[in-house]
């Protein structure tokens, strides 16, 4: 993690939250400080209309407490994911959103590089 220029975390939403294993992994990282000012993008997905937005908000809150560099344009919620993503990855709207998120993350990486 220390050598990574950025981190992308993608999670489903389970019972209006992030999976316990992801939370546990983040808890282990807290004391290391490896996410401090590290550019991060966070993505949630669910088969429902909420797109995992509750899990995404929870994840974003945890990452911000850890002082990760997580601007709003590096957050993405994907609703109805089971209908959108095919083996070919052909959902155009989702593809556009993912490209925009990656552009925002690259800008965040550039800003972090200039600041250090």
Name each region found by the language model.
Residues 69-116:
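Glycine-rich phosphate/pyrophosphate-binding loop and the adjoining helix
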Residues 1-67:
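Helix-loop-strand module that forms the ligand-binding subsite of alpha/beta enzymes
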């Amino acid at each position: 993690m220390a050598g990574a220029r950025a981190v992308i975390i993608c999670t489903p939403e389970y019972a209006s939250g992030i999976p316990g294993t992801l939370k546990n992994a983040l808890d282990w990282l807290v004391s290391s400080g490896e996410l401090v000012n590290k550019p991060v993008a966070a993505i949630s997905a669910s088969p429902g209309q909420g797109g995992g937005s509750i899990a995404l908000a929870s994840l974003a809150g945890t990452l911000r407490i850890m002082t990760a560099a997580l601007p709003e344009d590096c957050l993405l919620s994907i609703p109805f994911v089971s209908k959108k993503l095919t083996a070919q990855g052909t959902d155009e709207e989702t593809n556009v959103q993912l490209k925009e998120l990656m552009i925002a993350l690259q800008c965040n990486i550039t800003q972090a590089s200039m600041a250090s």
